[in-house]
Amino acid sequence: MGSTLKHLLLLLLVLIRHVDSAAIVKSLPGLEGRLPFELETGYIGIGEEEDIQLFYYFIKSENNPKEDPLLLWLDGGPGCSSLGGLLFENGPVALKSAVYNGSNPSLFSTTYSWTKMANIIYLDQPVGSGFSYSRTPIGKSSDTSEVKRIHEFLQKWLSKHPQFFSNPFYVTGDSYSGMIVPALVQEISKGNYICCKHLINLQGYVLGNPITYAEHEKNYRIPFSHGMSLISDELYESLKRNCKGNYENVDPRNTKCVRLVEEYHKCTDKINTQHILIPDCDKKGHGITSPDCYYYLYFLIECWANNERVREALHVTKGTKGQWQRCNWTIPYDNNIISSVPYHMDNSINGYRSLIYSGDHDITMPFQATQAWIKSLNYSIVDDWRPWMINDQIAGYTRTYSNKMTFATVKGGGHTAEYLPNESSIMFQRWISGQPL
């Protein structure tokens, strides 16, 4: 009898270990009343033993969830939680910037959410970011391993939500996800050819200020800085003449170039590289004490996500996560995709649509760098450079290519959509519905 009971308990433990959790969230601390949208959170187990547990937030479209596109949103980093994308960039709720007094930070409903026209899965990846965790040590993650894990996540998530198999599917994200998203699109596309009875209805992808070939793209920071009047004409001409376009991995024997690059950094070190017009108040922690700093919101999101009531509302499994961080920079990680340009080329050949947008006040990933790799794909222009408008005002500039790739700048935007979420939302809404920007 004792042996039978022991075996039953072991079987129960195995079943519990392999059950993926999902729960509907009716309300959130900091927001009054019931949620005006449908939110589901949960974990999907990854790997043979499903030791990796990837946490997600799923928000149904507020328009027509049965037919509207399904998006997967990935934040950058690597190691940044997609809760940041939800609360800062394109979700239906956002954090109020107010002095933290020890109580839970407040939320408000937004008018710019992408969920007004799409279903969105916000995924915490790689494992170790956000509320995702592993039951056992997994060693170092990498770009390529994460691509396979995210693909597995999608297959399992859709098998549990089969009503979304037929929805047009897009992979979306910004910043470092520029390395992951194109490779993931290729992985899904290949998977559709070799498997299964239910195919992912892959249509394309969306990327904002994407890192694509980091070591090469950094060289565009100096031309960008000159164009924005952060350095003088004389310094710029000397840099071009003596560095020959290579400003990052400078040969130490080229002493003239070394000295000139040092002069450049003296001019720009106190500039906020994410958005050159916003005070760089986060590096010394000034934002922690004053909501006058834009990045005070980064402090507030950590206060909110580490509140026990919030974790209970989100159905985070107790004991699986210590301190929640907006970005976990300590995850062991191998950046083993050197350039995602070949993936863009492959995805273009396979006919997938893409929207690539750039906030034009971002030094981290200058729009000139993005234009350069798009040009290197060597596709013809079908709709040449022109302004795109909102309420008869120029919101940015756009160009469309024969590979179904649309490039757009967001005038006054920064490294992510959070700086101008309304403009970014209108741009996305037009593109996803097939309208010209």
Curated annotation (Swiss-Prot):
**Gene3D superfamilies noted in UniProt:** alpha/beta hydrolase
Q: What is its main location?
A: secreted
Q: Where in the cell is it found?
A: Secreted
Arranged from A to Z, the UniProt key words for this protein are:
Acyltransferase, Disulfide bond, Glycoprotein, Secreted, Signal, Transferase
Q: Where is the signal peptide?
A: 1-21
Taken from the UniProt entry, a GO cellular component term is: extracellular region
Please explain the role this protein plays, according to its UniProt record: Involved in the biosynthesis of sinapoylated anthocyanins.
Record's protein name: Serine carboxypeptidase-like 10
Tell me what organism the protein belongs to: Arabidopsis thaliana
Organism taxonomic ancestry: Eukaryota, Viridiplantae, Streptophyta, Embryophyta, Tracheophyta
